[in-house]
Amino acid sequence: MVRVGIVGATGYGGAELIRLLAGHPHVEIASLYSSSSEGDGLEKSFPHVAGLGLPTLSPIDADSMSGVNDLIFLATPAGVSSTLSPKLVEKGVKVIDLSGDFRLVNGAVYKTWYKHEPAPSQWVEAAVYGLTEWNQEQVAGASLIANPGCYPTATLLALLPLMKTGWVQSNSWIVDAKSGVSGAGRGVSLGVHYSETNESIHAYKVASHQHTPEIEQELQKQSGEETLVQFTPHLVPMTRGILVTAYGQLTADVTQVQIQELYEATYADKPFVRVRPAGSHPHTKEVYGSNYCDIAIHVDQRTKRVILLSVIDNMMKGAAGQAVQNMNVMFDLPEKTGLPLVPVYP
């Protein structure tokens, strides 16, 4: 059994990890940590987990974590993991970090976009970017995983197959993304109050969202050339789900059939990416509660653009689900273990 601890157990990401790990056949939830509810049972914050026999919440302390956990999930705000993760890894504990602290290779870029001091460079270099479908071999041997952001996951899985083909101008990508409000976390914020979000949709952090450089960095790794992305996120009045619509300018006379075949071949052995039939229109409802990313390809021959549609559950493939997928790979377990294979519908 893999003994796991969860730091940030009283947030949405922590709660979703508990939902998955409580039923995982190879996991024992050994410890839960919170900076605000020490000594409480988690059911005080989340009544829906009552009866699971979970440990009470403990204070966050690296020294006490090392003896009882094989792996720690860090579902914490930016700036926390950068100091805690190195201490844990040095004590022999593997770490999967759900924050952005180890995703960006360039410390100056991190500071610009996240407004925090970056993690020590040697630890950023040691971290593996946990987009499982593209970095599975590296994930398997890692001690520190930078779990990708929700928007980057939906975007990168859609765009990456095209980045080495030369079929699309690398700087032409426009990414329109829409997310449910759970992506903002559980903290109180005016922007996610019911009366503010119900029957409304709005863009936010236009040209300034911190996931922008993460997307560009990973695309550039595949293309080998500087890649800029116009990324605009929107908040929509639903709890879970992300829909990405990405537009790229074609540079070659390729057909939708060719691109469809490329994607089907790329993801043929990837259990959590479903390439939908040509011309499909995936709904977020069709991946709700699951670890799937559904992708559909369209080509507008009139404008010579490829249009990619990608949907995920932001709490699952965009956060906790992908983290559990990475854990499975790290501990040489079947990749799908403990992850629901049928989305919740309707």
UniProtKB/Swiss-Prot annotation:
The active site is at residue 150. It is found in: Cytoplasm. Keywords: Amino-acid biosynthesis, Arginine biosynthesis, Cytoplasm, NADP, Oxidoreductase. Its EC number is 1.2.1.38. Its main location: cytoplasm. One of its GO terms (molecular function) is N-acetyl-gamma-glutamyl-phosphate reductase activity. Pathway: Amino-acid biosynthesis; L-arginine biosynthesis; N(2)-acetyl-L-ornithine from L-glutamate: step 3/4. It catalyses: N-acetyl-L-glutamate 5-semialdehyde + phosphate + NADP(+) = N-acetyl-L-glutamyl 5-phosphate + NADPH + H(+). InterPro entries: AGPR_AS, AGPR_type-1, NAD(P)-bd_dom_sf, NAGSA_dehydrogenase, Semialdehyde_DH_NAD-bd. One of its GO terms (biological process) is L-arginine biosynthetic process. It comes from the Bacteria. PROSITE patterns: ARGC. Belongs to the NAGSA dehydrogenase family. Type 1 subfamily. PANTHER family: N-ACETYL-GAMMA-GLUTAMYL-PHOSPHATE REDUCTASE, CHLOROPLASTIC-RELATED, N-ACETYL-GAMMA-GLUTAMYL-PHOSPHATE REDUCTASE, CHLOROPLASTIC-RELATED-RELATED. Catalyzes the NADPH-dependent reduction of N-acetyl-5-glutamyl phosphate to yield N-acetyl-L-glutamate 5-semialdehyde. This is N-acetyl-gamma-glutamyl-phosphate reductase. The lineage of its organism: Bacteria, Bacillati, Bacillota, Bacilli, Bacillales. The gene is argC.
